[in-house]
Amino acid sequence: MSRRCDLTGKKANNAFAVSHSHRRTKRLQQVNLQNKRVWWPSGNRWVKLKLSTKAIKTLEVKGLEAMAKEAGINLNHY
């Protein structure tokens, strides 16, 4: 399974770890993903999604169906 948000598509970012002497080595900044069970009212059931914490906050404002429509995903497959 990929470390990617189901609704926003967020994934890891390439960055540098910078030491005190300013030597730079490559590292990954991972997305803060949470396995979340979300109630889907029109489907009348729970849906298990892997969401970033930013997506969870946005979900409370927009709602599940609006975000799924924007992402172009079919909730019947989850």
UniProtKB/Swiss-Prot annotation:
Alphabetical list of InterPro entries matching this protein: Ribosomal_bL28, Ribosomal_bL28/bL31-like_sf, Ribosomal_bL28_bact-type, Ribosomal_bL28_sf
GO CC terms: ribonucleoprotein complex; ribosome
Lineage: superkingdom: Bacteria
Keywords: Ribonucleoprotein, Ribosomal protein
Keyword Transcription: no
Annotated Gene3D superfamilies: Ribosomal protein L28/L24
GO molecular function, one term: structural constituent of ribosome
Family to which the UniProt record says this protein belongs: Belongs to the bacterial ribosomal protein bL28 family.
UniProt name for this protein: Large ribosomal subunit protein bL28
